[in-house]
From Swiss-Prot:
Annotated pathway: Glycan biosynthesis; glycogen biosynthesis
Family classification: Belongs to the glycosyltransferase 1 family. Bacterial/plant glycogen synthase subfamily.
Catalytic activity: [(1->4)-alpha-D-glucosyl](n) + ADP-alpha-D-glucose = [(1->4)-alpha-D-glucosyl](n+1) + ADP + H(+)
List of residues binding ADP-alpha-D-glucose: K15
InterPro entries referenced in this protein's UniProt entry, alphabetically: Glyco_trans_1, GS/SS, Starch_synth_cat_dom
GO terms, biological process: glycogen biosynthetic process
Role description: Synthesizes alpha-1,4-glucan chains using ADP-glucose.
Record Pfam families: Glyco_transf_5 (PF08323), Glycos_transf_1 (PF00534)
Group of enzyme by EC: transferase
The protein's name: Glycogen synthase
Organism of this sequence: Lactobacillus acidophilus (strain ATCC 700396 / NCK56 / N2 / NCFM)
E.C. code: 2.4.1.21
Gene3D superfamilies noted in UniProt: Glycogen Phosphorylase B (3.40.50.2000)
GO function term, MF aspect, one: alpha-1,4-glucan glucosyltransferase (ADP-glucose donor) activity
Length: 476
């Protein structure tokens, strides 16, 4: 079985969010299980030198982008059993960062066509071509309608994974001829059109053999008006081929027993050592050293989607409890400013670090008692999975992947892995925090829940097994 992944980002080369984590982990796990795996990526300027120096040049060809003939060089790298192909074009990709350029539409139109043309030229014809998010969502359509005449491509099955439906790739109708050399008939017929734009995501949903998203709950939610981002009717129409498969986390990387950046390593059988990480975190952030005070951590982009307004509305009230809170992240300047203002008023209770700091994040996962994740919507979420792995009990809005991965504590059975609130309101969030604080005082019960949380299996093996089954079903 040969599977070719493609997307706009992939750890460890370049990553801005969950898409990069998935493309950095799922192919690796599949390779461990004997699948012949490739990943095609743009060769961005920011590729770290330790990888760039090992790239092997394989050749080049021309990609027509409308009336323009654009160079495409192919470089390869084999890492952890995965074949990586890098699409080289300095005009499109020799720039800082990944996204946010005025010509992103043209850049990823070029990239998608380069991916398709590369497969035959460099003899990597997959059984399954696995596309990710809008940057590659037009590929199933192009493969079928523009390159359908290529015999080598006729057996390829396509999967489109939606990591975040908010971003859809909406472009003017003139981009059909200008980027793809295709006529307006496809637009006029409505096949690629949505709200008078070409919509790559909508088209990919229609043309892909299977559509997946990153949790079962999110797969259901995006078929509703509330969460469907205008594509709910299309997704309901395609519900027969829509599946939610949870993301995983790297159990080797996120392991409190071996994590090199935390103060004291621990596991489910030596949870008493976790308190040393808490004290170390309090020292590092200049909080009063109080091992018995509940410490809530939050590692997040500071945006409305992540529930920051909800948090701001209730933060003064929460800080009246006997609690310490540590928030790490950056994002919307308004939320950054407001959080810093509140932190100045509560120097012994609240620390806000406006940064993206992977090592400090690890120390927060290890040192906190509980982890707050009040997202307005969350396709899957990785932070709550890491928190569970570290025995740091999540407090979550029961939505999307958060609902699928956090087993909300039941006081009658004394079982669960965290705390939740169904209604997206400040009052309900505070009630969930109060339940956490009450359980924290019951040390034996708290320890029991921590152990259940740490034994939860959200490794990539579970996800990879589900995808392998889907690939097998597709190719027969």
């Amino acid at each position: 079985m040969r599977v070719l992944f493609t997307g706009a980002e992939c750890a460890p080369f370049f990553k801005t969010g969950g898409l990069g984590d998935v493309l950095g982990s799922l192919p690796n796990q599949l390779a461990k299980e004997g699948v012949d795996v490739g990943v095609v990526l743009p060769l961005y300027q920011d590729l770290p030198e330790k990888y760039r120096k090992n790239l092997k040049y394989q050749g080049n060809f021309i990609v027509p982008v409308g009336w323009r003939n654009q160079y495409c060089g192919i470089f390869t790298l084999k890492l952890n059993g995965v074949n990586y192909f890098f699409i080289d074009n300095e005009y499109y990709f020799k720039r800082p960062g990944i996204y946010g350029y005025y010509d992103d539409g043209e850049r990823y139109a070029y990239f998608q066509q380069a991916v398709i043309m590369m497969m035959e030229r460099f003899d990597f014809i997959p059984d399954v071509l696995h596309c990710n998010d809008y940057h590659t969502a037009f590929i199933p359509f192009l493969l079928h309608e523009k390159w359908g005449f290529v015999d080598a491509y006729k057996g390829i099955k396509t999967i489109l994974t939606i990591h975040n439906l908010e971003f859809q790739g909406k472009y003017n109708a003139k981009t059909l001829p200008d980027f793809f050399g295709m006529n307006y008939d496809w637009f006029d017929s409505g096949i690629v059109r949505m709200d008078n734009d070409v919509n790559w995501m909508k088209t990919g949903i229609l043309y892909a053999d299977r559509v997946t998203t990153v949790s079962p709950s999110y797969a259901r939610e995006i078929q509703t008006v509330e969460f469907g981002q205008g594509l709910d009717a299309i997704l309901r129409m395609c519900s027969h081929k829509l599946t939610g498969i949870l993301n995983g986390i790297d159990f080797e990387k996120y392991n409190p027993k071996t994590d090199p950046v935390i103060k004291k390593n621990y596991d489910v059988y030596h949870l008493h050592h976790k308190s040393k990480d808490k004290i170390a975190l309090q020292k590092e952030l200049d909080l009063p050293i109080k091992p018995n005070i509940p410490l809530i951590g939050m590692v997040s982009r500071l945006t409305a989607q992540k529930g920051c307004q909800l948090l701001l509305d209730e933060l003064d009230n929460i800080l009246q409890f006997n609690v310490q809170i540590v928030i790490l992240g950056n994002g919307d300047p308004y939320y950054e400013h407001r959080l810093m203002e509140i932190a100045e008023r509560y120097p012994d209770k609240l620390k806000v670090i406006l940064a993206f700091d992977v090592k400090l994040a690890q120390r927060i996962y290890a040192g906190a008692d509980s982890f707050l994740m009040p997202s307005a919507f969350e396709p899957c979420g990785l932070s709550q999975l890491i928190a569970l792995r570290y025995g740091t009990l999540p407090i979550v809005h029961e939505i999307g992947g958060l609902a699928d991965t956090v087993w909300v504590y039941d006081e009658t059975t004394n079982e669960g892995t965290g705390f939740g609130f169904k209604e997206f309101s400040g009052y309900q969030m505070v009630q969930a925090i109060k339940k956490m604080l009450a359980l924290y005082q019951q040390k034996n019960n708290w320890l029991k829940i921590q152990k259940i949380a740490m034994k939860s299996d959200f490794s990539w093996k579970n996800s990879a097994d589900k995808y392998k089954w889907m690939y097998g079903e597709l190719i027969g």
